[in-house]
Design a protein with these regions (language model features):
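Two-component/phosphorelay signaling modules centered on CheY-like receiver
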Residues: 17-34
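Acidic, metal-coordinating helix/loop segments flanking the phosphotransfer/catalytic sites
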Residues: 35-53
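Conserved Asp/Asn-Gly motif in the active-site loop of CheY-like receiver
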Residues: 36-40, 95, 113
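Acidic catalytic/metal-coordinating carboxylates
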Residues: 38, 64-70
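The feature encodes the CheY-like receiver
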Residues: 61, 91, 110
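Alpha4 helix (beta4-alpha4-beta5 surface) of REC/receiver domains from two-component response regulators
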Residues: 67, 90-107, 118
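C-terminal output helix
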Residues: 111-120
């Protein structure tokens, strides 16, 4: 296992604590984590840390995850952070909307743990 300081840092932004805990359990000990319950906390986490990837819920209190993602992409054009959007809304239109907003990947809830883990791993390795 990599030394703690060398493990990639992932920002998990979801308003539900049990889901944040599940995502950490699914992704495992190979990563470090910073958590946010809403967009404001996610913005603070981005200022204070340098995550290698973001796992982002769509439905958040206040500003939506997709609004945050669109703003993030507009601000960070030179070195974008890979973003995986997770959402219970899974229609083709919902997925297209997330990808159009700047998501690198979309994983529907409930998700297969292997799917989420492989998507995050691939985005960090890219």
């Amino acid at each position: 296992m990599a030394a703690p300081a060398l493990r990639p840092l992932i920002l998990i932004c979801d308003d539900e604590l049990p889901l944040r805990e599940l995502i950490k359990a699914v992704l495992g000990d190979g990563y470090r984590y910073v958590e946010a319950e809403d967009v404001g906390q996610a913005e603070e986490a981005l200022e204070e840390s340098k995550p290698e990837a973001i796992v982002l819920d769509v439905m958040l209190p206040g500003k939506s995850g997709l609004e945050f993602l669109s703003e993030l992409r507009a601000k960070r054009r030179k070195k974008p952070i890979p973003v995986v959007v997770v959402s219970a809304w899974q229609s083709a239109d919902d997925q297209r909307t997330a990808l159009d907003a700047g998501a690198d990947a979309f994983v529907g809830k409930p998700f297969d743990p292997k799917d989420l883990a492989s998507v995050v791993e691939a985005l960090i390795a890219a």
